[in-house]
Structure formats: C-alpha cells, structure tokens
Amino acid sequence: MFQLKSAYQPAGDQPKAIAQISEAFDQGKKKITLLGATGTGKTFTMANIIQKVQQPTLVISHNKTLAAQLATEFKAFFPDNAVHYFVSYFDYYQPESYLPSSGTYIEKEATINDEIEMYRLATMASLLSRKDVIVVASASSLYGLGQSRFFEENCLQLYVGKKYDFNDLKRQLLHMQYKPIHGKIEKGMFEMRGDILEIFSSTERCLYRCFFDEEFLERIEMRDAQSYELKAPVQKAMIRPATQYLQDVSDLETILQQMDAEKELRIKEFEKMGMSIEAERIKKKVEYDIRMIRETWFVNGIENYSLYFDQRLPGQPPNTIFDYFPEDFLMIIDESHMTIPQLRAMAQGDRARKNNLIRYGFRLPSAIDHRPLRFEELEAVLGWKPLDQVALDEAAADLELVSSAHQQVLATQTEKEQKSDSSLLNREARKSNQHAVLAQKVKKDAKSIFLSATPAEYELELSEQVVEQIIRPTGLLDPITFVYPKSGDYQLLLDSLPKLLQKKPQLSTFLEEEPEQSATLPNFEELFGDE
C-alpha cells in the first residue's frame, strides 16, 4: 500500500522515535505523544510511521495554512498514494444568527471555493474505494457530512457496451445534484447533445464524454476539463455525487410530514407563550422550506433538518469524516497543544448561536442537532476514553433546549414504530440512546499520535507512552538564549562589555541595528575606539 519515497534517511533522534512508536503499537498501545523539538523533522517521522503501520491516516491541524503545508509534504513523500486536503470549503462564511439585544437577524452568507469542495469530495470518494489514503484536515472535520453508505450507493457507474436509458441517466444525475449546463461550465455539471453525454466530474479535473449508439454506450473518453484535450479512452467511469450532503429522499413525504408536525406544535407552543411574531415567523420559514424541498429536493439551509434526513434522535452524533474511515486507522493530531482546544470549542460555539435562532422562531428546535461532533463524542469514537467514562452532559442540555413540541413529534414516532419501519427513529435498526449510537461509531482499533514540541497536560495524561525527539537530523543545537527585561537594557549592555568586547562581530551588528541608542552610550569611543 503505502510506499514512502524520499532522498533522505532518518537521522538524529528520528530512528529512535520511529522504533519506539512502532514498538509501542506492536505492544497494543494506541495513544502516544511524540514530544518533538522544533526542526527535528516530526513530519518525516510520521511518514515513516505511516509506512510501517500501513493503515489509512487522518492528520488534523489547527489551521488551513498548516494543513496545506502538511498535505504538500505528504504528497511528496507518498506520490503513488492518495493524499487529500480536507478543510472548510468556504472562502467567506457568515453563519446565520440572531442578536436579541438589537433585534438583528443575520442571514447566512457564504462563498464556496470550488477547488476545495472538489478536494473534499475526492477525499470521500477515495476513503470509500481504497485503503492507501492520507487525509490532512482542519478542525472543521468535526462538522457533519452525508451518510457514507448513501454517498457510496448513489454513484453512477458507466460501462462501455452496456445499455442505458437517457431519461434514467438524467434523473440520476439530477438526484446526485449535477446540474444541466447553462452558460458557464463548472464541475458537477452535465450536458446531453444528441447521442453524446458530457459529465464534468465533481471529484477530478476532467470530463467524461460518453458516445451512445441508440441506447448502448459505445465509447467513453476522459478529457481535460479546461482544454478538452483527450487524456485517454476508458472502459468505465465512476461518477460520484456532486455534493457531500446528498440526502436520502426515498421517503421524502414522511420526512416533510415530520417537519410540518414539528412546525405546527412549535407554533402552538409560541402562541401559548404569547409570542405571535415568533409563531408567524417559524410558520412562514418552514412552509417555504418544505415547498422547496418537495419541488427541488433542496433548499438553502437544508442542513438544519439533518435530524430528519439522517433519521437520528436528539443528541445523537452527526455523520462525519470519521465514519468514512475503517476501524483500524491512524489518527495524528498535529500541534496537539493548539489543535485539541480547538476541537473542544467547536460544538460549544455552534450551540450558543443556535440557541437564539430556535428561541426566536428562526429555526425549529431540531436544528440544534445540525452540529459538529462534540469533543466528548470524539474521545469515545477514537477510543481515547471508554464509552462509559465519557461525559455527555451537553447532550442532556440540548434536550432541555429542544421544545416540548419536538418531543411530542418524537413521542408520536415512538407510537408508530410498531406499525412502520420507515419512522423517524427507525427503532429496530438504530439504538434509541446516544451511548448506543456512539458505540456503533467507535473505532476499536484506531491508533492516535499527538505531535507537539510543548504537549499539554491533557495529551500527556491520556498517552500510554511519551516518545522524545530532541536531536535534529542536522545535529544542530539551539543557541543558548538569555531573555532580559526591556528596562535597563543598555545598562546591562555596559555591565556585559568585558565579555562582549571579545565578540565584536555580534556587538557591531547590535550597534548597526540600533545606531541612535548606541550613540547615546557613555564613553562609547573610549570603549570601542575606531573599531
């Protein structure tokens, strides 16, 4: 699978660190901290570990820029394997929010980076089709995605020599959120011209030009998406969905009925509290959304109804990139002292914002469950803590926020459960409490490495072993540095002159950088003469 290619060999403390981490994994340890000084080549050490464990790998960094740098480095180390960049695809993002103090409603605004969206879709496609995958992600990986099973099942496979119905192809492409070409050609579009079907891939920089003889697929050409230059004729083409949030709409009417039922009960709840403005607000909002979803299978903000589309219970964790990984994968937390606090804070900020939207009638209470994975849930999924030791207090707090209207909808579904297998809760197929659902998501054989020059107390206590990497491959040492207060710095310089006079090059550099201050030093010429 993984084949590391590099002109360098491990040096300094790298061989020792690689051996110790590998041995720890062989002994069954799953949580390790690599305490590596700056400049010791921790990324190269991780590349060697990836080659040794031969498992799909997820690397999480605390910002996009560092993640991009790491992805570039890993691509250089593993040119023959799938290395992906998985970060937020927004160039600009203003979340939907409401400020009660000023009565200001801020509508969601976002500018999507098509290139990064393609990277994300390609990541999901690779994880479902191969094992030699390295994903470099940011903290946004905690946010929800479409169900991995549904994403995989809704791929269009085209084979030369097979018979296809054009109307069925068009219907399936539309369902996969591909759009007919109107004006500007972009990824995730398709065009039918006579007996030719062109599909602009959502996961690759190419288009597939399919030639039909009546209903038989005669030839497939893979072409460059910009120049249209022929890359190669192919015998088959795998077309992946054009969105990462593809929803199961096979029982759409039931989902819409559930949304409408929650809306009606929420209206009654507002009216009972004398909140007529909020009641009218939520009525108009949900009715418009239902109409759009029924007609187009989509509406802006559809993610706020993910509880219904995903058939989840309140408080249950969302589907994330972790669901696309197998049970035996390698997790690397880069700069863990910075990244872990970010992972911990993601859900808290999201919940505070949703609170106002729900209380003032801009969203249904079920919107609280469109959220990132909580840190406590992440601990359980990755096996950092046993499930019975994971605190899920915030999930209980969410249930307090969920209105009695929403709870009545859930109660109604409970009564219907014995009569229907397609209920919101789908009780026979899913567990009805958060612990049980988390248990289904736990990656029992996952391994975790925390990388940091200054690991925090959390990862040090969590780790079963701490490996040090101090000596650089170059053998260079850090210079001994003394830090003094700014006040009295020139007096300190004067007091240090006997030693500094023996190191004139360093002293002259200081004087060149600070000419005005150095000119005020007493007896300057007497001390230094003409030098």
Which residue stretches match the model-derived regions?
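ASCE RecA-like P-loop NTPase motor cores
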Residues: 1-531
